[in-house]
Amino acid sequence: MKKFLPGLLLMGLVACSSNQRMSDYSQPESQSDLAPKSSTTQFQPQPLLSKASSMPLNLLSSSKNGQVSPSEPSNFMTLMGQNGALLTVWALAKRNWLWAYPNIYSQDFGNIRNWKIEPGKHREYFRFVNQSLGTCIEAYGNGLIHDTCSLDKLAQEFELLPTDSGAVVIKSVSQGRCVTYNPVSPTYYSTVTLSTCDGATEPLRDQTWYLAPPVLEATAVN
């Protein structure tokens, strides 16, 4: 037994050394570091689904006073980047940033990833209403937030510019800049920013989005 003790001690020291080297290379990621700073931004570890009772989907429709009511699931869609990431709410409180998350990493988000496209106050523009929260996408600073819908808010109006790939470029009417994301983000999510409109499809910068079907909970068929 004594013959094996030195060998076992040596193996333990090597394992500890290897673990230390691996931990030295790990890169901590902070989601709050990736978005413009704002006193209105509140970051949470994950979306907290509302406990309020919801209206049956068959009673949903939009009203003329600018307040949003529910609607049939077929009236909703996702805004999907070329890498499959979906534009989504992350923190449920109003005036928080929007992000782009792949479906596989945002299944717990539920319907906050779905949007309804509606005419804006001006005929040629549109606004996007969240299915779960009833809030609207709004251009703010260098990115997008979600806030109470109002037809009088120009920051909530967007122009859809078609491309020859079937995708669209989403242009903020108030800022004249376009919604941009990183299609090869090193994290499982991507920041969403506003930048000069050029229809970019570069490796680290993309402005093309697809109006895709909504993500819905699937039911297994026995």
Swiss-Prot record:
Taxonomic superkingdom: Bacteria
Gene Ontology cellular-component terms listed: cell outer membrane
Protein topology in the membrane: Lipid-anchor
CDD domains named among the record's database cross-references: beta-trefoil_Ricin_CdtA
Residues spanning the signal sequence: 1-15
InterPro entries tied to this protein: CDtoxinA, CDtoxinA/C, Ricin_B-like_lectins
Lipid moiety-binding region (S-diacylglycerol cysteine): C16
Positions of region (Disordered): 22-44
Annotated lipid attachment (N-palmitoyl cysteine): C16
Compartment list: Cell outer membrane
Ricin B-type lectin domain span: 122-211
Keywords recorded for this protein, A-Z: Cell outer membrane, Lectin, Lipoprotein, Membrane, Palmitate, Signal, Toxin, Virulence
A GO MF term: toxin activity
Segments of this protein annotated with the region Mediates binding to target cells: 90-101
Function field: CDTs are cytotoxins which induce host cell distension, growth arrest in G2/M phase, nucleus swelling, and chromatin fragmentation in HeLa cells.
Quaternary data: Heterotrimer of 3 subunits, CdtA, CdtB and CdtC. May form higher oligomers.
Protein name per the record: Cytolethal distending toxin subunit A
The organism of origin for this protein: Aggregatibacter actinomycetemcomitans (Actinobacillus actinomycetemcomitans)
Designated gene of the protein: cdtA
